[in-house]
Curated annotation (Swiss-Prot):
Keyword Electron transport: yes
Residues reported in the UniProt entry to bind [2Fe-2S] cluster: 39, 44, 47, 77
Signal peptide: none
Protein name stated in the entry: Ferredoxin
Species for this entry: Solanum lyratum
Pfam families membership: Fer2
Family classification: Belongs to the 2Fe2S plant-type ferredoxin family.
GO cellular component: chloroplast; chloroplast stroma
Domain 2Fe-2S ferredoxin-type: 3-93
Amino acid sequence: ATYKVKLITPEGPVEFNCPDDVYILDSAEENGHDLPYSCRAGACSSCAGKITAGNVDQSDNSFLDDDQVAEGFVLTCVAYPKSNVTIETHKEDDLVG
């Protein structure tokens, strides 16, 4: 399946289609959208975003705790879309506070 991903970035919203077996960060880059990242392995918070609609599979994430996931935080480098999803990007500062 392929889903619509909407990213709310500091420069404004962008939308693209993302297959359910491609990480959102990778798909964003393939569509010409630069997002922050560091490790690309789900082990840091550089790529963190916050889901405002929809849901993802980020079972490869090793950084976020259950409470952060429940609040909607997502590591875009290890997140597969599981529905149409809207994510606010550039949320590392909110996460690490």
